[in-house]
């Protein structure tokens, strides 16, 4: 087979990938992973797998030194000498780092000691993607490293407490991660970037907002309370999708998070701890994205109990979370589930687990729609009819 034949095959795969749906994309990704393993020797498989932590570490080094941003912003390749001048790093050390980054595809080598951006470079030049890497490396990394020992010490029993999970052992602290984070502003900021990292699919494109509103909207009423909403990215998406929709949008989060939020037209920010009574009464939507997966069931029950008394007869709780299928769980969903377990004693839930959680507080799920290939879904909960 010639090089031209290979290019034709690759082009065909790219063409098929571009036109298929999310399920098809996931299947292609899976086939490519299987194909890679089939081409590797046992040594290759071990080395490839074991290189993962180093790749993440080199990504963080690239972020810390501003390498990715410099390469992305340059119209021409940049030499090692130029990067040394910008960073002040040792030429020999930086040369070894750059060539390894290039070997992993994090940057692209164009000649001897000369580099330009790759597709990965462009991703990590994005401030939200860079912040997400920092958060995952600094917080999730140490937890992942000691997970095997932690599980063995506990005789492989379930983790159900955010005060007794891998995080406490990894960081030598009696605090939960969310108690520890406000004492470390750098990590609060990187967590905000992780939350703000754009997903290619949004709930606003899949939930029938207008149909559900009916005659509810009015300029003086609260359309949505975005609880634990971070920088307000989901409220901003709703406002962008429906710019003329009347009603107030209120983003609630703790002060340390809101300190890094940027003002936005038509969006209000309010300091609020969701373990305290919900102060906004009779909103149409009480929206929570990626809140419940951070917490064991006991705390999730407390969060819901703060919202229910504030609900009016037309109110709905919108839960934007994964719904784990019984088989064929996407790697992104399975990965996130264990990250939540390690750091927070949290969990990505199945539909049965969601139903059980709602049952504990007298709610029922009246709608459920999975809207992307990672099993992200909108669950609509209301007080159970008697």
From Swiss-Prot:
EC class of the enzyme, as a word: transferase
Pathway(s): Mycotoxin biosynthesis; aflatoxin biosynthesis
Residues at which substrate binds: 137-150
TM region(s), chain numbering: none
A Pfam family that the UniProt record links to this protein: Methyltransf_2
EC number: 2.1.1.109
Region (Substrate binding): 177-197
Keyword set, alphabetical order: Methyltransferase, S-adenosyl-L-methionine, Transferase
Reactions the enzyme catalyzes: 6-demethylsterigmatocystin + S-adenosyl-L-methionine = sterigmatocystin + S-adenosyl-L-homocysteine + H(+)
pH dependence: Optimum pH is 6.5-9.0.
Binding site residues for S-adenosyl-L-methionine: 228-229, 253, 273-274, 289
This protein's record includes keyword Methyltransferase: yes
Catalytic residues (positions): 293 (proton acceptor)
GO molecular function: demethylsterigmatocystin 6-O-methyltransferase activity; protein dimerization activity
GO biological process: aflatoxin biosynthetic process; methylation
Kinase in keyword set: no
Residues making up the signal peptide according to the UniProt record: none
Function: Demethylsterigmatocystin 6-O-methyltransferase; part of the gene cluster that mediates the biosynthesis of aflatoxins, a group of polyketide-derived furanocoumarins, and part of the most toxic and carcinogenic compounds among the known mycotoxins. The four major aflatoxins produced by A.parasiticus are aflatoxin B1 (AFB1), aflatoxin B2 (AFB2), aflatoxin G1 (AFG1) and aflatoxin G2 (AFG2).
Family: Belongs to the class I-like SAM-binding methyltransferase superfamily. Cation-independent O-methyltransferase family. COMT subfamily.
Name recorded for this polypeptide: Demethylsterigmatocystin 6-O-methyltransferase
The species this protein was found in: Aspergillus parasiticus (strain ATCC 56775 / NRRL 5862 / SRRC 143 / SU-1)
Classification of source organism: Eukaryota, Fungi, Dikarya, Ascomycota, Pezizomycotina
